[in-house]
C-alpha cells in the first residue's frame, strides 16, 4: 500500500505541465529580481551622471548689476536683452539669458555670469564690504561718503536701499568697486554711552568741600532759581563749569548734587546725563562728532518746562585735548570744534548746564576753558585734616557696631591723626629729580575715596571677625569697628599705595596726583 502511494507521487513529479509551471515561477522570480537590480543601477547611473555634470559645470562669475541696457523683441517674438554690469572695476555690457527676467534685476544687485559672459541668474545683494560714513546727501539721491582716513567719494544707492532713509553720519556698506551703497548699518546710539538718572545725592551728603560747594551754588544754582533777577541785571548764566583736581575728591558727587538741588528748586525731576570722555572717542571719521551732537540733542529733548538737565562729562582731558600737541592721533582737531559748537548753542537752552571733570586741566584745549565756554573753574583740592574729619564722619557713624566705650568721633579723629602723620611709618617714597627731592607721605595723596576705602577696610575686618568668632564677646577680640582695626586698614592702604608708586613712572604719577617736587633738601 505504501509503495503504491510513493509510485503515484513520483509519477506526478514527472508530470511535464507541473515541471513547466515550476520553472516558470522560478524564471518569473529571477526576472523580477533582475528588473529591480536594473532599476537600482539606472538610478545610481542617473546620480553619477548628475554629479559628473555638476563637477564639469564651468565656474560662474559674480558681478554687480548697474542697469538694464536694452530689452526688445524681434519679429519672431524672440527677446533680446543686455545689461550693464560692474565686473571688478570694469564696466561691461553683457547679454541676458532667456531664463532671466530683466524686470527683477535692480542696481547694486548681484548677478551670475557664465563662461560666455551671459547673465544666467541673480543672487542676493551682499551685505558685507567696506564701511563708510555718510558726509552729505545730494539732491539726486547720491551720497558723499568718507573712509577712516577722511578720503571722500560719491556713491549711488543700490535698489535694496533706494527708499531707505540715510542721514548724515550714518554708517553704510558699499560694494568693493566703491559705487553702490548696499546696506545701512545700525548706529551706535549716544544713549548706549549715557548714564541717565535722577540723582538722590544732596550737598549734605558731601563732606569737606564747603568752599567748592558754595562756589558752584553761586555759579549754577542762582541762575536757575532766580532767573528774573539775572534778567533784571542783564546777567547771563554760565554755560558750563569745570571741576578739576586730583582724582577721588568728589567731583562727580558735586555734579550729581547740583542736579539734585536744581530739581528740588524747580519742582521738577532733574536729569543727570553722565558720559566718560574716552567712551566718545571712535576711530571712524565723524563718529565721535555725531555722538557729541546726539548727547546735546538728548539734553534738549529732556529739558523744557523748567526741567533742569546736567550734562556731566568725566575725564574731559581725554576728549578735548589741546589741538596740535601730537599727544594723540589729532582726532581732537575735529572733536574740539564740534564740542565748542554744541556748547555755544547751549545759550538757547535755559535748562541745560554742562559740567566737566578732569584730573589734568593742563591738557584741555584753551578754547574750551576761555570765558564764555566753561566759565566757572572750581579746583577740588585734597582734604586737609578738618575736611578729612568731616568726610570720615559721613562713612563712620554711631549707627555702626563700634568698639565698646568708643564713639564715631573718637574713631574718626584717630583715623585722621594716623593718616596725616609725617614720619617713617607713613612715608611712601622719596622722589628725586634733577637735585630736587621730596618725601611723599600718605597725607600728600589723601582723598575722599581713600578715606572711604579705609573705613570699608575696617568694616570688612570687623565682619570677618564676627564670622570667625561669632557674636559672643571675647576679651581678647573686641567686636565691631575698633581703633586697632582702623589702624590695620590704614596700614593696608599704605602698603598698597607704596607698591603702586614703586611700579609706576614717578613723573607721571606726580602729574596725575597734582603734586610737584618742592625742594625739601638735596
Swiss-Prot record:
GO terms for biological process: modification-dependent protein catabolic process; proteasomal protein catabolic process. One of its GO terms (cellular component) is proteasome complex. Pfam families: AAA (PF00004), Prot_ATP_ID_OB_C (PF16450), Prot_ATP_ID_OB_N (PF17758). ATP binds at residues 248-253. It comes from the Bacteria. Residues 20-57 form a coiled coil. Keywords: ATP-binding, Coiled coil, Nucleotide-binding. InterPro entries: AAA+_ATPase, AAA_ATPase_domain, ATPase_AAA_core, ATPase_AAA_CS, NA-bd_OB-fold, P-loop_NTPase, Prot_ATP_ID_OB_2nd, Prot_ATP_ID_OB_N. SMART domains: AAA (SM00382). GO terms for molecular function: ATP binding; ATP hydrolysis activity. Residues 1-26 are annotated as: Disordered. Belongs to the AAA ATPase family. Homohexamer. Assembles into a hexameric ring structure. This is AAA ATPase forming ring-shaped complexes. It comes from Bifidobacterium animalis subsp. lactis (strain AD011). The gene is arc.
Amino acid at each position: 500500500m505504501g509503495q503504491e502511494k510513493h509510485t503515484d507521487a513520483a509519477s506526478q513529479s514527472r508530470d511535464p505541465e507541473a515541471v513547466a509551471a515550476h520553472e516558470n515561477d522560478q524564471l518569473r522570480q529571477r526576472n523580477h529580481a533582475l528588473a529591480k537590480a536594473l532599476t537600482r543601477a539606472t538610478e545610481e547611473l542617473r546620480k553619477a551622471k548628475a554629479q559628473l555634470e555638476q563637477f564639469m559645470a564651468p565656474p560662474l562669475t559674480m558681478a554687480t548689476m548697474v542697469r538694464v541696457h536694452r530689452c526688445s523683441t524681434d519679429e519672431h517674438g524672440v527677446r533680446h536683452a543686455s545689461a550693464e554690469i560692474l565686473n571688478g572695476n570694469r564696466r561691461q555690457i553683457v547679454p541676458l539669458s532667456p531664463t532671466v527676467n530683466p524686470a527683477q534685476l535692480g542696481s547694486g544687485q548681484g548677478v551670475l555670469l557664465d563662461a560666455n559672459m551671459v547673465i544666467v541668474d541673480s543672487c542676493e545683494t551682499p551685505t558685507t564690504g567696506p564701511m563708510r560714513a555718510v558726509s552729505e546727501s545730494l539732491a539726486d539721491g547720491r551720497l558723499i561718503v568718507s573712509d577712516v582716513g577722511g578720503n571722500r567719494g560719491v556713491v549711488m544707492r543700490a535698489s535694496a536701499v533706494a527708499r531707505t532713509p540715510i542721514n548724515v553720519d550714518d554708517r553704510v556698506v558699499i560694494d568693493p568697486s566703491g559705487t553702490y551703497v548696499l546696506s545701512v548699518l545700525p548706529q551706535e546710539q549716544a544713549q548706549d554711552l549715557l548714564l541717565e538718572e535722577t540723582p538722590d545725592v544732596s550737598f549734605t551728603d558731601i563732606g569737606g568741600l564747603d568752599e567748592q560747594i558754595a562756589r558752584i551754588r553761586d555759579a549754577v544754582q542762582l541762575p536757575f532759581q532766580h532767573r528774573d533777577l539775572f534778567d533784571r541785571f542783564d546777567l547771563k548764566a554760565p554755560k558750563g563749569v569745570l571741576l578739576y583736581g586730583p582724582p577721588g575728591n568728589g567731583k562727580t558727587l558735586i555734579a550729581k548734587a547740583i542736579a539734585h538741588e536744581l530739581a528740588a528748586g524747580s519742582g521738577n525731576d532733574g536729569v543727570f546725563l553722565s558720559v566718560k570722555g574716552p567712551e566718545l572717542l571712535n576711530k571712524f571719521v565723524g563718529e565721535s562728532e555725531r555722538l557729541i551732537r546726539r548727547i546735546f540733542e538728548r539734553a534738549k529733548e529732556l529739558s523744557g518746562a523748567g526741567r533742569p538737565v546736567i550734562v556731566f562729562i568725566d575725564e574731559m582731558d581725554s576728549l578735548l585735548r589741546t589741538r596740535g600737541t601730537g599727544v594723540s592721533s589729532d582726532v581732537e582737531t575735529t572733536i574740539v570744534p564740534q564740542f565748542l559748537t554744541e556748547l555755544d548753542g547751549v545759550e538757547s537752552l535755559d535748562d541745560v548746564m554742562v559740567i566737566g571733570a578732569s584730573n589734568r586741566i593742563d591738557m584741555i584745549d584753551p578754547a574750551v576753558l576761555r570765558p564764555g565756554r566753561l566759565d566757572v573753574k572750581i579746583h577740588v583740592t585734597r582734604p586737609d585734616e578738618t575736611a578729612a574729619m568731616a568726610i570720615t564722619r559721613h562713612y563712620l557713624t554711631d549707627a555702626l557696631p563700634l568698639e565698646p566705650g568708643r564713639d564715631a568721633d573718637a574713631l574718626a579723629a584717630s583715623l585722621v591723626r594716623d593718616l596725616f602723620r609725617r614720619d617713617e611709618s607713613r612715608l611712601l617714597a622719596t622722589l628725586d629729580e634733577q637735585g630736587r627731592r621730596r618725601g611723599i607721605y600718605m597725607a600728600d595723596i589723601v582723598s575722599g575715596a581713600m578715606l572711604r576705602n579705609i573705613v570699608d577696610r575696617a568694616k570688612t575686618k570687623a565682619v570677618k571677625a564676627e564670622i570667625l568668632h561669632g557674636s559672643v564677646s571675647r576679651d581678647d577680640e573686641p567686636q565691631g569697628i575698633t581703633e586697632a582695626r582702623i589702624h590695620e586698614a590704614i596700614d593696608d592702604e599704605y602698603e598698597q599705595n607704596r607698591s603702586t608708586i614703586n611700579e609706576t613712572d614717578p613723573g607721571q604719577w606726580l602729574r596725575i596726583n597734582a603734586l610737584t617736587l618742592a625742594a625739601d633738601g638735596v
